[in-house]
Amino acid sequence: MSVTMRQMLEAGCHFGHQTRFWSPKMAPFIFGHRNKIHIINLEKTLPMFQDALKFAKQVASNRGTILFVGTKRQSREIIAEEAARAGMPYIDSRWLGGTLTNFKTVKGSLKRLKDMAVAKEAGDWEKLSKKEALTNDRDLDKLQKALGGIQDLNGVPDAIFVVDVGYHKIAITEANKLGIPVIAVVDTNHSPEGVDYIIPGNDDSSKAVLLYARGIADAILEGKANSVQEILTAVKEGEEEFVEEGKAE
């Protein structure tokens, strides 16, 4: 779960945006500028990233869910792969308004997605006309693209992890309304407002995005492993206590 300064430098996490596109609220995390590009102070970023990793691990150890959100072209594949590796839901296509604040409606769409997938797998569509089957295929593709990453989500998540707050303002606003903690990568051109665990850093480089997403995924896997170990320990202690009581009788 550990991340080093060297890894962050090699991934280009320190490169911000052009100085004319900046948010003054990111000033505390900016080291300076070079060739009209802001340079992010990784000495500030590293401990903040580590705090975010600790939080992600804690959520996972409590058997919580963290929703990964990254819909930018250079983030999509990474977000989907790392979330899947960690066994967590993700949104790598367009964020649908109300995904969190109107989850009841989203749940209905998720049920439709599952029902359609089951019907297709069972061969039910073979009984339909060619036109009807084609329409169903298109509808299923649309639902899969929009909701495929959250099809196993049974309720609102315990936290969300966002890459690029500018792209996902609606997601952060919805999380804030529901009191869901937000972990987010914030570049120099955006405000960190609404983010509980800020990771000041480059949100455009795929190498940097991979470093953040892999770190969060690793932290989640560690947390899950801890949770399983605690359960096994509790079961073992319970069995030993039962044996001791049996001997006493």
From Swiss-Prot:
The record's listing under InterPro entries reads:
Ribosomal_uS2, Ribosomal_uS2_bac/mit/plastid, Ribosomal_uS2_flav_dom_sf
Record keywords: Ribonucleoprotein, Ribosomal protein
Gene Ontology, cellular component aspect: cytosolic small ribosomal subunit
- GO MF assignments: structural constituent of ribosome
Record's protein name? Small ribosomal subunit protein uS2
The protein's matches in NCBIfam families, at most eight in alphabetical order, are given as:
rpsB_bact
State the HAMAP family in the record. Answer: Ribosomal_uS2_B
Q: Name one GO biological process term.
A: translation
Q: Which Pfam families match?
A: Ribosomal_S2
Q: Which domain of life is it from?
A: Bacteria
Q: Which family does it belong to?
A: Belongs to the universal ribosomal protein uS2 family.
